[in-house]
Amino acid sequence: ASFLRSPALADAIMDLLKHRDGLMLGICNGFQALVKLGLVPYGEIRDMDETCPTLTYNLIGRHQSRYVTTRVASVNSPWMLKSRVGDLHTIPISHGEGRFVAPKAALESLIANGQVATQYVDAAGQPTMDIAFNPNGSIAAIEGIFSPDGRVMGKMGHLERRGQYVGVNIPGNKHQPLFE
């Protein structure tokens, strides 16, 4: 992420987002980069400090690779045009540093502004801290977030790892329509 802070790249990114109706999506390590840059949750490249959200090591202290169920918590983004609040998706995750953490004030702001995009949920479709469903222990079961204007989205789940013959033995809706 540090090379994206170079003035030429940072200016080009901000021009894309602010003047050319651009969108950015970061999945897994891409989400980590967007958070470290400040593009999510702030919508701009900025210096980060202890008052800012971040992604860190999974609570279990090791890599997790499996399918989880997520729930759409907000559709305040162009990325979610084909989704509805409450939609459930079964998606693969594969990470060792995917736990979203945030100070109380930052978390409250994300929730109040509708920037919590998706959350890990249990079998009843409810956000949970249970490690059986929330694979990294993310606060408020957060799997993905938006920038304030929704143009930038970051998420841990690998929605791109799907196909006609992928995960056929795993129940659930694997189609998360972000690219439509």
Residue ranges and their predicted role:
Residues V72-E180:
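C-terminal and late-domain segments of enzyme folds
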